[in-house]
UniProtKB/Swiss-Prot annotation:
Any GO BP: peptidoglycan biosynthetic process
Keyword RNA-binding: no
Keyword terms: Antibiotic resistance, Cell inner membrane, Cell membrane, Cell shape, Cell wall biogenesis/degradation, Hydrolase, Membrane, Peptidoglycan synthesis, Transmembrane, Transmembrane helix
Provenance organism: Campylobacter jejuni subsp. jejuni serotype O:2 (strain ATCC 700819 / NCTC 11168)
Name by which UniProt lists this protein: Undecaprenyl-diphosphatase
Gene behind this protein: uppP
Amino acid sequence: MENLYALILGIIEGLTEFLPISSTGHMILGTTILGIDIDEFWKSFLIIIQLGSILAVIFVFWRKLFQGLDIWLKLAVGFFPTGVIGLFVAKYLNALFNGWVVVGMLIFGGVVFILIELAHKNKQYRINSLEEISFKQAFCIGIFQSLAMIPGTSRSGASIIGGLLLEFNRKVAAEFSFLLAIPTMIIATAYSIYKEPELLGNANSLIPLGIGFITAFIVAVLVIKFFLKFISKFDFIPFGIYRIILGFVFFYLYYSGILNAGSEFKL
C-alpha cells in the first residue's frame, strides 16, 4: 500500500503545486482520505516530492532560464522579500497552522481572483513578456508571494494575483510565478532539512520515494503546459470558483468534526 499511497500523493503534488488552488489543502484531503499518519517518513516523502515539482519547472522553462543573467537577477530580487519576511515571521507561523485559516484563505483567494478578473475584463495588460518585468515589479511579486506563508493561500495563487494587479498578462504572471518557485522551493526545502536533519535519515524507503518523485515530476510537467495553454484562452475565474467550493468543503469537514481543524493540518 505504501507504493500506492506514494503514487497518489505524487499525483496530488504534481496537480496542485503550480495551480492557484492550494497544494497544502489538497494534501490535507489526500492524506486524510488515505488514512496516512504523518510520521517522520511521510514528512521526508513530502519534501522529496516537492523536488520533483521543482525539477518540472526547470525542465519546462530551461530555455528561458539559460537565455541570460537578467531572469536570474529578477528571480533573486523576487525571492528576497519572501526570504527576509520568512526569517522574521517563521517562528510565529505555528499560530496559523489551523484548518479554519485554510478555509478562510481558500475562500478569500477565490473571491480575489474573481474580482480581479471582473475588474480587468477587456483591459489591455502592460506587461506582455518576462523581459518587460522590472526589478521593482519582481520585488513586489516577492512580497505577494510571502503571503503564501499563510496556510491555504497558495504560493502560485499569491504571486499570480500580484502579477495581475501589476498588469502582467495572465501568461506572464503565471510564468514568473512558476520560475520564482525555483529559488523559493529549493531554499524552503533546504531550510526544512536544516531544521530537521533527521528527515534525511528517515528517507530510507527508496521505492516509494522514487515513485512519488517521478510521479510529481511527470504530472507537474503536464499540468504546467496545460495551465499555460488554458490561461491563454480563458481567465482565472474557474480557479476562483473552485477555491471557494473547496473552502466550503473544508468548512463542512471541520464543522462536522470529520476533520480536526488543528491536528490534521500539521503535515
